[in-house]
Amino acid sequence: MKLKKLLLSVLMLLSISGLQAQSLSPSTQIHWDKGTLVIETPERPTDQQHVLGLTAPKMETVRVAFVGLGMRGPWAVWRFCNIPGVEVVALCDYEEDRAEASQKYLRDASLIPADIYSGEKGYETLCQRPDIDLVYIATDWNHHFPVAKYAMKHGKHVAIEVPSAMNLEQCWSLIDLSEQTRLHCFILENCCYDYYEMNALAMAKDGVFGEIIRAEGAYIHELSAFWKSYWQDPNDNDTDNLHWRMKYNMENRGDVYATHGLGPVAQCMDIHRGDRFTTLVAMDTESFVGKQYVENLTGKEPKEFRNGDHTTTLMRTARGKVVEIQHNVMTPQPYNRLFKLTGTKGYATKYPTPEYALSGDVMKDTAPNMDDINAHSFLNDAQKEALEKKYYHPILTKFGEKGRAMGHGGMDYIMDARLVYCLQNGLPLDMDVYDLAEWCCLSELGALSMDNNCAAVTFPDFTRGHWDEMKGYKHAYASAEEEEATEAKAEAYTIAQKEVAAAANLWTLYDNVKNAADEKAQDKALKIYQRAKAKAHQQLAKKLKVKK
């Protein structure tokens, strides 16, 4: 009770000082037990069931709307324009011109123009539409949760950029919504789809490293060149002109961006699929660089800078394994996500160069010169090439080549294409709402640890008792016949969409609306465009019906 009062006092003080300590939840129930801070797991309401292995009916066409079109959102629109069987229905951003700018990707792909939404509550009008299946959220962090919550309450699946939830209260709310609505709540963790991580996952699942007993992950990325590029929310009381991300770091302690490092190693360690995180301890440095940045910008030293320059979180699992996660966006050093797996038979490490070390005859009959393998040194190039060829992940086989052509290392496209694949085939998604909660809760749990002299803090069981029912992490696949049929329908849809858009001359009519001389002319042009677009959708439905 004393701790609860202390936390509430801290939150009130931060509120009075203008800070929004979003990594702390007033609703979190906590108590001490023998020096450990115990986070209580709320009971599941009687009318809810878990969503492990959740599926939704197959979608021949995935109708998607995008909310948040600043830094990452526009590239997501571009990627979806290159995935067959998708219709981009709507584009939304607080600033209308940013939403409008992303139309160029649909224009370049000769697709039907999307509808535009803007303003503080534009996403609410968007979510009320009946013709949207998926809302793809790439806003600033503060808006991830409210947009997702509203979308799910209006019957939409959601895919949320990271971090998808900022505290435990938001984690539990998304879990309850997914369980109540039976809708997917997908964390857009692209690093789970990078090539080295996917191949290492395939190796781990086949026992190449033996039992994985320890793992490391990180987000180490000096962001000094980006701080001013982040959006400045006019409603966020940003009087010091910090822009949202630096402001969030100043106001919040803990690993506020854990998922890039944690997601891939959690999959390798079967988290909530036979094991679960039970306890963490977090420790951070003082803020040296962050605090100095604010002082240089404002001319005065900040009263408080909550986020340390480097944060380290150690976690233990129910099966006695350990994971270490680091966060540093302040100090100058090469980009690094660590990704290290320590197993009873081998070791994998991605940075600074991707390597493997194996013991015994793990690679028997796989690569040349196997007699001299031992774990005292990394595999040579020929051995490494043979290992990666043998364990090249099936998802990379399907999407990897096009992914590389789409930029950013390919992992973003692979993530989006795989998401659409699962929705079109009615399969469980690769990450569920429990993954989202487990990977995003480090911010609040770590802050609680560090605010209490780096005390041990327990994890709640986000599955509420079901973490040991699924044995091992795995991806779901359709049969070859089902894949072929689904892909044929998807390709046919995209071809037909392009044909009706061209036949109706939609982009010329769209431009007529934008270039109208006055309001009266614009109203007239808008009516002509809307009639043509409605007719194009009717023609599209007819084309697809004939092809069936």
Swiss-Prot record:
Sorted UniProt keywords: Glycosidase, Hydrolase, NAD, Signal
Keyword Magnesium appears in the UniProt entry: no
Enzyme Commission number: 3.2.1.-
Cofactor note: Binds 1 NAD(+) per subunit. The NAD(+) cannot dissociate.
Entry keyword annotation includes Glycosyltransferase: no
Top-level taxonomic group: Bacteria
Family named by the database record: Belongs to the Gfo/Idh/MocA family. Glycosyl hydrolase 109 subfamily.
Protein name, UniProt field: Glycosyl hydrolase family 109 protein 3
Lineage start: Bacteria, Pseudomonadati, Bacteroidota, Bacteroidia, Bacteroidales
